[in-house]
Swiss-Prot record:
Keywords assigned: Hydrolase
Gene3D superfamilies: 3.60.21.10
GO MF assignments: bis(5'-nucleosyl)-tetraphosphatase (symmetrical) activity
Family: Belongs to the Ap4A hydrolase family.
Role played: Hydrolyzes diadenosine 5',5'''-P1,P4-tetraphosphate to yield ADP.
Family matches, as InterPro entries: ApaH, Calcineurin-like_PHP_ApaH, Metallo-depent_PP-like
Protein name per the record: Bis(5'-nucleosyl)-tetraphosphatase, symmetrical
Organism field: Psychromonas ingrahamii (strain DSM 17664 / CCUG 51855 / 37)
Length: 276
């Protein structure tokens, strides 16, 4: 059994299928891990969710910020924008079933055999990996319970920027969600910084650094993440794997086979799109 880990799909269903064919993925034998953001901005979010759900236990995903945003749209908390390209999914007869399945997916996964963990955006340098797993479970318990709508309504915002283990309620949950699904840069003390969208080489490293460059980062396990398409899979230290290579932006979809660390890539077949 091979373990394949693919970066953010964002509804790029055709590219995902081509990539799996290229790697000779066997759905009844192999496992497919996905770094989150299955949906949003790409043309086939509905087909992507249906396919991944159909894989059953062969698929292991974590939730990304776009997946959480989709859940909020479905609950009427936010409106569906044309740029999200989610209308086909939201109007599908199996939408409720698909999004219930999505809501019960985790924010953090640890492989039971290999020494790696997978999250969408990263692990806060103010946490250990073991703490991150526990904090993710706090959010999952609410997301999978009766109070999930309240959580989805109040998860938006950039504060608090620094972790305080004594914090409670939505501030605590928002930090956990932001660290696991939105984080790119941190201040040197490990607090979250959401205002810079530049590539790392264009930033002042005496003020902010990529989260994986903060020296307090726990690397007791390898860390696999997506989210940060501008990295194009490069620039991380040993044991840190960035797999979002910006397929939805016109670049490519990338997938790592863990056993031999072979990387597979398939170029986007559509016209390049631009962020607004």
């Amino acid at each position: 059994m091979a373990t394949y880990i693919v970066g953010d799909v964002h509804g790029c269903f055709d590219e995902l299928q081509a990539l799996l064919e290229l790697a000779q993925f066997k759905k009844n034998k192999d496992q497919l891990w996905i770094t989150g953001d299955l949906v949003g901005r790409g043309p086939k979010s509905l087909e992507t969710l249906r396919f991944v759900k159909s894989l059953g236990d062969s698929a292991k995903i974590v939730l990304g910020n776009h997946d959480l945003h989709l859940l909020a749209i479905h609950q009427g908390i936010h409106s569906d924008k044309e740029s999200d390209k989610l209308s086909a999914l939201l109007n599908a007869p199996d939408c409720d079933e698909l999004l219930t399945w999505l809501r019960f997916q985790p924010l953090f996964r640890r492989h039971p055999e290999f020494n790696f963990v997978m999250v969408h955006a990263g692990i806060s340098p103010q946490w250990t990996i073991q703490q991150a797993q526990g904090y993710a479970q706090e959010v999952q318990n609410i997301l999978q319970g009766n109070e999930f709508k309240k959580l989805l309504k109040n998860m938006y915002g950039n504060h608090p920027a620094s972790w305080n283990d004594s914090s409670q309620g939505i501030k605590r949950l928002r930090f956990i969600i932001n660290a696991l699904t939105r984080m790119r840069y941190c201040l040197l003390d490990g607090s979250l910084e959401f205002y810079s969208k530049l590539a790392p080489e264009q930033t002042d490293s005496t003020i902010i650094k990529p989260w994986f460059e903060i020296n307090t980062l726990d690397q007791s396990s390898d860390i696999i993440f997506g989210h940060w398409a501008a990295l194009l899979g490069t620039g991380t230290k040993q044991g840190i794997y960035a797999l979002d290579t910006g397929c939805v932006w016109g670049n490519s979809l990338s997938m790592l086979r863990w056993q031999d660390k072979k990387m597979f890539s398939f170029a986007c077949q559509r016209q390049r799109v631009h962020s607004k």
